[in-house]
Amino acid sequence: MIVGEEVKTATQGEVIGLFLNERIPRGLSLEQTVAEIRRQGGLVYVPHPFDRMHTVPGYEHLLPILEEIDAIEIFNPRVAIGSFNEEAARFAAKYRLIAAAGSDAHVAAGLGSVRVRMRDFDGPQEFLESLRDAEIHTKSTSLLYVQALKFLETKATPQGARRARRARRVRRAMRKS
């Protein structure tokens, strides 16, 4: 089992720490979050790096920490526009980063959209070596699929519906002010 955490940074989206021992506080800068992952001896994994539909670290944030990135996600089925995944694959190839993929499943229906076949490993370094040689198998996804999953996870439950209504009220109030 790999203990990891997806951490929301202050303004540059999310970064995943793998092989962690402690929780990492939310709201740190990207650089501070990466430093905290490293302090714990963890690996730095950048998820959905060019999904411009969400807050993500752009080139200006990734290039300064390039040496600290252990793996970068080149396929995420929840990315609404396929070219964002393609851009991540080009970035990984250009900078010789280890390519990874994840289902980013927030609901059970999203499981199995990506499979990463890799040999057994023991510890962070063997994990990286195994991931470098891994086979990534993906299922194509459509914008409709992504939006349906998003609906299921945010509005199909009573709590999700309440959150969505509250968010709409806040947006309307902000537009009026």
Question: Language-model features: where?
Answer:
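Charged catalytic cores and adjacent phosphate/nucleic-acid-binding surfaces used
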Residues: 2-3, 7-24, 32-35, 52-177
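Phosphate-handling active-site elements
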Residues: 27
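Short beta-strand/loop segments at the ligand-binding rim of alpha/beta enzyme cores
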Residues: 39-45, 49
